[in-house]
Amino acid sequence: MNKKIAIVGAGFSGAVIANQLAQAGYTVEVFESRPHIAGNCHSERDAETGVMLHVYGPHIFHTDNERAWEFVNRYAEFKPYVNRVKAITKGQVFTLPINLLTINQFFGKTMGPAEAEEFLQSLGDKTIENPTTFEEQALRFVGRELYEAFFKTYTVKQWGLEPSELPASILKRLPVRFNYDDNYFSHKYQGMPAEGYTALVENIINVPGVTVHLNTRFDPDLKSDYEHVFYSGPIDAWFKHAEGRLPYRTLDFETFRATGDYQGNAVINYCDNEKPYTRITEHKHFSPWEKHEKTICYAEYSRQCEEKDIPYYPIRQNREKAMLELYVNKAQNEPNVTFVGRLGTYRYLDMDVTIAEALATSDKFLESARTNARMPAFTIDPMA
């Protein structure tokens, strides 16, 4: 039996699958087109400031998934970290997600939880009974003032689309709290790897039986050299964009350095048109256990992803999902290839979900090998 496995991409998906299959006795080759592992989670020390830099933008690990949390803690020391996001709009600084402090500050009131909830309900547009767009959803639940201050312009900057063009599902879970909790996430486990994400991925992938080829693109014509291929690149690229290019948003970062503390917080969103960027990230605040005299910041801009750009956020509108379905159908007929991860399934995925799915995919492959069953092209439904 050919026990050689090819994995395309050395982000979390590829690294976790490589880890699991190598420990099960397979010989694994990982092909990574970039000069580094860890994908968009890549972190490195900034030479000038010494700050741990989230090279492709901020990543905070947060999860309720016990298996994913236990897995990452096996390969890195995690420091406690709580993401507390601020937002600038109408010339003031507010807390996000919208909470009791945000509501009271915005409206100049001193309401308690029940009063604030009733007040917010009174602001909602009751004429919208079944919201179908992002805009309708926001107007229905928070009213026009909060919608225009915090959601409308920011959404246009982030997605390049009007909120009236986006589905309501983006805002299904209304980010409003009627207390003073300013933790951006509500998950049980939250933290940051002490030595950065690339060190974590390196520890995951650095097991006997795994060889990593950096700066190397995998040729699909070589797939017959392997028992199986796990592909975490863009699904449309595997098929040479035969049905067209699946669109993404990409990010540009304007990097600047300063002495001391630039903004006093890791992330500040800019929700109105006073600034063209969506947010400023000050990286040293992601590692509060470290001390640095200087600081490095990113001003972040979102735009349509072009052919040579790094894809970040899939645009899963109706037209895009129709194109995705064509690729999914092609993938179902591709023997001995499984499509995984954010790009391989054309979905926005948090790190913990990526890791949990990679572990489940590894389990499925090992079970299929034991039972001589066919390994599917997907272990989740990318159309869901």
Provide a role label for each language-model segment.
Residues 3-30:
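N-terminal Rossmann-like FAD-binding beta1-loop-alpha1 element of flavoenzymes
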Residues 12-13, 35-37, 49, 101, ...:
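Short, solvent-exposed loop/turn segments at secondary-structure junctions
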Residues 22-47:
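Glycine-rich FAD pyrophosphate-binding loop
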Residues 24, 216-326, 332:
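Mid-domain catalytic core of redox enzymes
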Residues 45, 282-384:
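Conserved flavin/dinucleotide-binding core of flavoenzymes
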Residues 49-125:
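Dinucleotide-binding Rossmann-like beta1-alpha1 core, especially the glycine-rich loop
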Residues 82, 212-216, 341:
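Short loop/edge segments at beta-strand edges and connector loops
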Residues 90-228, 232, 239:
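Active-site/ligand-binding neighborhood in enzyme catalytic cores
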